[in-house]
């Protein structure tokens, strides 16, 4: 069953449908699967409500937290920690390719019996090579940095707030959010692509996204802030957006 994105009412409808299967005996297992952060929009899944519905219907909760582990939550443990529901999530999945250093590989974390089952039945795991020791060591070091200090996380969110404020002052339309992914909305796919190209000529690399990656008529340039960015970097990016917009508008 598929439920509408972040729509708790529709999720309830789908859970009720699952419970009605097999002459009312319900599905053998029910798992609610969601991203922790939706990467094209930068907004967070309503995890408290999802966990409440899981409790009501006896479902498990699985969260793909690829865009949150490392900087969301008090200790960087991700979206469930941010919402205070870590103990109500049964299965975490994620990647080592984003906040944890940009390397390859990923993980599944959960109860021992679930992980043991996946070791035997998870086809991507069964038919994949092991991670290189260098990647494992780099990821462990990144986790130590995340757990050891909140300074980088604080810098990241200051940078995101500064970028949002400055872009708003320059008249750009942004999606609301509290994440370091900041979508700058243009609507028209060709327009977003031309502005991204114009910015690259100024040395600022951004990526335009359009349908079918995002809904029709909601083309955007997705910006991902980093704790490594300085205020000067952010001001330069804002200036490049302004110059790119002006250049495209002038033809």
Regions found by a protein language model. Name each.
Residues 57-60, 67, 72-178, 190:
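Active-site C-terminal subdomain of aminotransferase-like
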Residues 201-204, 213-251:
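PLP-dependent enzyme catalytic core of the Aspartate aminotransferase-like
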